[in-house]
Amino acid sequence: MDIKRTILWVIFSMSLVLLYDNWQRSQGHASMFFPSTTQQAASAPAASGAAAQGDVPKANVAPGAAGTAAPAAPQAAAQPTGEKVVVTTDTVRAEIDTAGGIVSRLELLKEHEKDGKPVVLFERDNVRTYMARSGLIGGDLPNHTTVFTAAPGPRTLDGAEQLEVALTAEKNGVKLVKTYVFRKGSYVVDTKFAVTNAGAAPVSPTLYLELARDGSKVEQSQFYSTFTGPAVYTDADKYHKIDFEDIAKGKATVPAAANNGWVAMVQHYFASAWIPQTGKEHSFYVQQIDPHLYRVGVQQPLGELAPGATVTTDARLFAGPQEEHMLEKIAPGLELVKDYGWLTILAKPLFWLLEKLHGFLGNWGWSIIALTVLIKLVFFPLSAASYKSMGKMKDLQPRMTSIRERYKNDPQKMNQEMMGLYKTEKVNPLGGCLPIVIQIPVFIALYWVLLSSVEMRGAPWLGWIHDLSVPDPFYILPIVMAVSMFVQTKLNPTPPDPVQAKVMMIMPLVFSVMFFFFPAGLVLYWVVNNILSIAQQWQINRMLGKGKAAVVAKS
């Protein structure tokens, strides 16, 4: 069996396995490759109210120590009750629970689900737990289990540029004033902390900022899986993703103490992050709170406070979509939460170019088409070489068939004759494959660009395509892709082996069924690429035909 036949059989076999796996998922069975969100949600319910609200972190063992936080101190079983302060801006609707002063719910008003409702990022109910918490440790001090008092004030912007929600709590002579500042058009909530020692003895509090989340994915994948979990960034250690599984097994590590960086929770299209004050020494921690709840956080020592003294610090809480340019302006490295996979070095320039095209064309669908044309032009010399090689191989098919028939009982002699034929005619049997292989990394990088870019979410193209991030609802693009692949097989040399020929005929159907489950934006790229390839191949075949006719005329 030659190399091409082996490659085809591998592709064909993988396609059948993936199709069977997708059918299994559609019947409610477990996937062989990807985790099922439904199953995770069923087997991993949200943490109980006491657990989700009650676990206060301990101070890290030593400043600068890398690793997970020490186990939390035992907490009282009773869960505090408070009021819900609902804040509405033009971008978010946030719910602040005065029991702990936590952001317990956050809706993104400019991002919508399929039913038209806003995307809910932070949430705390019987199904999901995801919230932003903060407080003081270093004694029995105000923390996210303490009931705060909310100061009166506006709760909607109503034409203003910003609004503030001040929360106050006092415990054991230490008063904490936590102020959330919401701004117009922003997904960043500035958070101010003022700590006053109203007691008679010095105290040394440490501020903690953390994101607590259950370990389930928000949405189920079909043929792809995106990262969900904590991440930590420092200038020294750069971007560091942490798997929930590693946290549960005690294998997770975090960077050493730094005076910069941030902690985040990442999911497909969206992220949240606590960004502490730059220039202040702080340490990081990750921890499994209970079997279904995890947290990532940062601790900042505030120093010793004498009686009557006050110390202030601030931080920023980001919660929103992974829009790359917006993230770049918020904090160094925050754009890295947008996961391009292992081909980031190729994906980032592709997205930059795609965004420039969108700025000119105003439609992401047409921008994908324009980008496909540009990529095709860049790879035109390689593609032309590939088609010319395939054309030469097509001309040699009769002689190759004759050699196979003549030496069918002597494989070694047959291979020698084949190599001699290739050498005489100056043909590389892999010449048609190599240019295609070189283009594969670009295709994979573009795949991740289209998969990871929240800009595609809810972006229409034309007609029936109302969202480029979801599959074509009427399967028109996959069908067009199948037709284009079928036409391509007709332009390629017919394989001499009957089995290989049948595989080539079946492949368009297999790929079209696979692409039923891919985002419409990615299928659009593939369709346009195929159509351009057909036009290019037809033109090159036509030129080769003219060249042969000229040779015959001269002879």
From Swiss-Prot:
The keyword Transcription does not apply. GO terms for molecular function: membrane insertase activity. CDD domains: 5TM_YidC_Alb3, EcYidC-like_peri. Residues 62-81 are annotated as: Disordered. Keywords: Cell inner membrane, Cell membrane, Chaperone, Membrane, Protein transport, Transmembrane, Transmembrane helix, Transport. It is found in: Cell inner membrane. The keyword Transferase does not apply. Gene3D superfamilies: 2.70.98.90. One of its GO terms (cellular component) is plasma membrane. It is a multi-pass membrane protein. It holds the Pfam family YidC_periplas. It comes from the Bacteria. One of its GO terms (biological process) is protein insertion into membrane. The chain crosses the membrane at residues 7-24, 334-354, 360-380, 430-450, 468-488, 503-523. InterPro entries: Membr_insert_YidC, Membr_insert_YidC_N, YidC/ALB3/OXA1/COX18, YidC/Oxa/ALB_C, YidC_ALB_C, YidC_periplasmic_sf. Interacts with the Sec translocase complex via SecD. Specifically interacts with transmembrane segments of nascent integral membrane proteins during membrane integration. PANTHER family: CYTOCHROME C OXIDASE ASSEMBLY PROTEIN COX18, MITOCHONDRIAL, OXA1. Belongs to the OXA1/ALB3/YidC family. Type 1 subfamily. Required for the insertion and/or proper folding and/or complex formation of integral membrane proteins into the membrane. Involved in integration of membrane proteins that insert both dependently and independently of the Sec translocase complex, as well as at least some lipoproteins. Aids folding of multispanning membrane proteins. This is Membrane protein insertase YidC. It comes from Cupriavidus necator (strain ATCC 17699 / DSM 428 / KCTC 22496 / NCIMB 10442 / H16 / Stanier 337) (Ralstonia eutropha). The gene is yidC.
